[in-house]
């Protein structure tokens, strides 16, 4: 029987990881033993389901467990000598990871598995990118013309790219900044890692949207932060709560909330700025998917409304161009620019200057604006097609939360069903999506599917939805899905 110590300094997920690992290595949990579902294990131990998911993920990643499509999580077969060796190493007291390393290794991840059809959220239509233009711009700078492009210069970004980003943000998002305030980094996760290093101390309170971006959760937790949920509901963000402890940092995605797609109203933006000032807290504004608003007028970024210099703005080109470009940016208050420069230099979180030079031309010569307009039209049309297909073929099992922006939609189940169960069944049909429950870290998770549509053409969309339909039918025939419709769960935004 597994017993966890609630008074110990070791996090619950780490205790559970160590105990399950020890049981496997000792042979008490034998190969081909099926582990309880995450919800059942959580109820038996009196912990959150995310604690169990985090533990299972860590053991899956290290090869102690294996996931079998449609049948759950099982103990993997380990070579006998490996078990003996690992046991002896453990008894000898081998060096272990640091506390920070343990936190990082144990963080949950949004698993993606190679598959035939992937409803990946936030994935752009790469085939529509003007690669011939991009190749020409790269070739322009690939010829040796200036030593600065091939050395360790400009660690916070190519000057022309910083200027182009600053001008674009001023014109399109109302962001007020000089080029010197723009820090160019290796994508969103690099930005989050730098922000966590620079702004958060061990034990600091951070308000985090729930449901919210798992990458931000992981970066803050790895820095030793204590996450306090900032609930996102149908009528907006739950900002006022006197029982919520004073934060050091507040993380929000106000332009297209991840994953629900809500838009934070102007009055809530102003209220959040007041809250940040009252608590002397940093506000990290991830302007996720702000470029893809299909209806209504865009709301300016919070950074441009900030009068006290506490909003740090971040964005990425992964969603507007292509993911492997790995170029993102942070806009920091002027007084932080020099400190961020030193951290970026020391961590190596800066992308290729050759790519930056080509991107600067891509923006300044108008190709970026043209591509955005084209993608906005394409994604708006794909959203209409996707919603219509879901309503036509999947209405017996789910409803779609429509919104006016973004590259994905949230589907809610009309019957009692765990999204991880559907996820495993969908894998068996060659389809992948992101379960909604993985985006919760504190409250009982809502069940649903985050379905990306932007990077999928209508023909593939139909195939994927038919495969999802087959997954639902398979669950019905196996008895895993009740035939009666359940009361709809809270719909969020």
UniProtKB/Swiss-Prot annotation:
Keyword Ligase belongs to the record: no
UniProt GO BP: biosynthetic process
Occurrences of domain HTH gntR-type (ranges): 10-78
Record PTM N6-(pyridoxal phosphate)lysine, positions in chain: 319
Molecular function per GO: DNA binding; DNA-binding transcription factor activity; pyridoxal phosphate binding; transaminase activity
Residue ranges of DNA binding: 38-57
Pfam families tied to this protein: Aminotran_1_2, GntR
InterPro entries to which the protein is assigned, alphabetical: Aminotransferase_I/II_large, HTH_trans_reg/aminotransferase, PyrdxlP-dep_Trfase, PyrdxlP-dep_Trfase_major, Tscrpt_reg_HTH_GntR, WH-like_DNA-bd_sf, WH_DNA-bd_sf
Cofactor: pyridoxal 5'-phosphate
Keywords, ordered alphabetically: Aminotransferase, DNA-binding, Pyridoxal phosphate, Transcription, Transcription regulation, Transferase
SMART domains: HTH_GNTR
Family according to the record: In the C-terminal section; belongs to the class-I pyridoxal-phosphate-dependent aminotransferase family.
Function comment: Could play a regulatory role in the transcription of the moc genes for rhizopine catabolism. Could also have an aminotransferase activity.
PANTHER family membership: HTH-TYPE TRANSCRIPTIONAL REGULATORY PROTEIN GABR
Name of the protein described by the UniProt record: Probable rhizopine catabolism regulatory protein MocR
Organism: Rhizobium meliloti (Ensifer meliloti)
Lineage: Bacteria, Pseudomonadati, Pseudomonadota, Alphaproteobacteria, Hyphomicrobiales
